[in-house]
């Protein structure tokens, strides 16, 4: 059995994720000491969220207690929590061969001054996050960390009504006094999480880092656009800035955001009455771009609710390959170990501070943060344009779930890579065939059929990965090498975002 992550050494024994030897699936056991519930008191409602396992600022805990306080704006906060719960239970695309549903409980992270709720759909194509910002909370969280939270059926049914009945007190976990008062016993529920679901959680963070603000709509314009999006569109649509709003087109153009499977934005609907604006994010595209992921963020005043959707409704994030270059980079892995020691549950990670404290160039810090995203240890906040610290209890297995990465390492071990004398590429022998890799921008190219099919849109093929690793090692071995200070020598490494 594999350990959960270095940061969760005790979870395997206390109900965290257990992994099979081939790491095709993970069985996650949720053990809640106090199942979530809504209670009604005189003049107020109380939402008590049960917690199961997790890491905190003082180490792993069985049932972390993070926060008790009133919500400044109960309506949007409750609607956002219900939206996260809905995405966790949804499958927006169901292949004919799929019968069982994946229902993984949301994750909540306490970052010292805010709470973040995250969930991931069963089809691996939609990621949801609710950020309750400092102004949304009366008082600060008592502890920092991440944990799973129970969103059982009864609690979900009562939450909507509680939000409109007056002041709302939220508790994430319970202190010992509350536990004794409630007299609760541990309840357990197990869920099997496929490898593609686990990988997808990391892919979302890496893809978000490359997105930019495409458009910002305010008030009624935001509501009008979301309500007017056709839910049954069979092909990807493109949202194009037009005046103060957005128009939908059937083909890409510069400055547009892709929207494949518009029905996947359904969870924005119940929040529209609270929305002050809508921000749309996506990677740079051109006139002939293939479908790409996008993010749709509702401004709720003291909170934000964001849906990030994959490039196609039938295509989960786990196939994007955005993290493969970083996972193949031994230097990034070593730097990530150093950087992880310096993380302190920051709501906004200061890459400059990490660079100074770790003594690493900015490019290596950026690569290390990308590596930590792959292992579920940092997320990316589009509004803040920065990573934030959070720990997910299923990170250590992610690296072994990427067959292209495994294939690249096998090619390296077999001595199948011959670098070009001019450093512009390599010849990689695989399956009795020689494939030519060319190092170029924006994507390295390869003559293999897999690269010809996807042309870099799903990350590098195993031949490109092997060639880049070989080039990096050759550069490191060169006398007087300055590779340590270069962001361009390592696959998947991006320049630091301003």
Question: PLM ranges: what are they?
Answer:
Residues 1-498:
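Long, low-complexity, compositionally biased intrinsically disordered regions
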């Amino acid at each position: 059995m594999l350990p959960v992550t270095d940061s969760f050494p005790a979870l395997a024994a206390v109900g965290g994720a257990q992994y099979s030897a081939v790491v095709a699936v993970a069985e996650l056991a949720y053990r809640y000491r106090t199942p979530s519930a809504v209670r009604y008191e005189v003049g107020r409602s109380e939402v008590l969220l049960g917690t199961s396992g997790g890491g905190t600022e003082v180490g792993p805990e069985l049932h972390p207690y993070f926060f008790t306080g009133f919500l400044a704006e109960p309506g949007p906060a409750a609607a956002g929590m219900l939206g996260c719960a809905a995405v966790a239970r949804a499958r927006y695309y169901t292949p004919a061969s799929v019968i069982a549903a994946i229902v993984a409980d949301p994750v909540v992270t306490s970052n010292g001054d805010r709470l973040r709720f995250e969930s991931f759909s069963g089809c691996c194509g939609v990621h949801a996050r609710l950020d309750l910002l400092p102004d949304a909370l009366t008082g600060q969280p008592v502890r920092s960390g991440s944990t799973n939270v129970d969103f059982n059926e009864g609690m979900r049914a009562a939450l909507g009504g509680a939000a409109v009945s007056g002041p709302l007190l939220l508790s994430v976990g319970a202190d010992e006094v509350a536990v004794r008062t409630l007299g609760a016993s541990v309840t357990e529920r197990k869920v099997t999480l496929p490898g593609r679901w686990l990988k997808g959680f990391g892919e979302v963070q890496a893809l978000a880092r490359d997105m930019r603000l495409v458009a910002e709509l305010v008030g009624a314009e935001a509501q009008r656009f979301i309500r007017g999006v056709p839910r049954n569109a069979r092909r990807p649509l493109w949202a194009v800035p037009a005046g103060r709003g957005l128009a939908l087109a059937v083909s890409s153009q510069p400055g547009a955001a892709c929207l494949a499977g518009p029905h996947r934005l359904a969870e924005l609907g119940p929040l529209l009455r609270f929305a002050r604006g809508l921000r749309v994010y996506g990677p740079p595209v051109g006139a002939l771009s293939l479908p790409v992921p996008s993010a749709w963020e509702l401004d709720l005043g003291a909170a934000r609710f964001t849906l990030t959707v994959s490039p196609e409704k039938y295509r989960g994030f786990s196939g994007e390959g955005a993290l493969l270059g970083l996972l193949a980079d031994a230097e990034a892995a070593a730097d990530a170990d150093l950087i992880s020691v310096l993380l302190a549950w920051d709501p906004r990670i200061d890459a400059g501070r990490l660079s100074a404290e770790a003594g690493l160039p900015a490019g290596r810090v950026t690569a290390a943060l990308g590596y930590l995203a792959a292992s579920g240890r940092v997320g990316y906040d589009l509004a803040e344009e920065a990573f934030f610290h959070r720990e997910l209890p299923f990170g250590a297995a992610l690296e072994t779930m990427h067959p292209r990465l495994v294939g690249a390492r096998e090619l390296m071990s077999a001595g199948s890579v011959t670098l070009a004398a001019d450093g512009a590429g390599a010849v990689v022998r695989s399956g009795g065939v020689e494939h030519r890799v060319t190092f170029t921008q924006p994507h390295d190219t390869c003559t293999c059929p897999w690269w010809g099919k996807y042309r870099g849109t799903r990350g590098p093929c195993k031949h490109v990965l092997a060639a880049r690793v070989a080039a990096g090692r050759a550069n490191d071995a060169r006398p007087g090498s300055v590779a340590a200070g270069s962001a361009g020598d390592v696959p998947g490494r991006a320049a630091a975002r301003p």
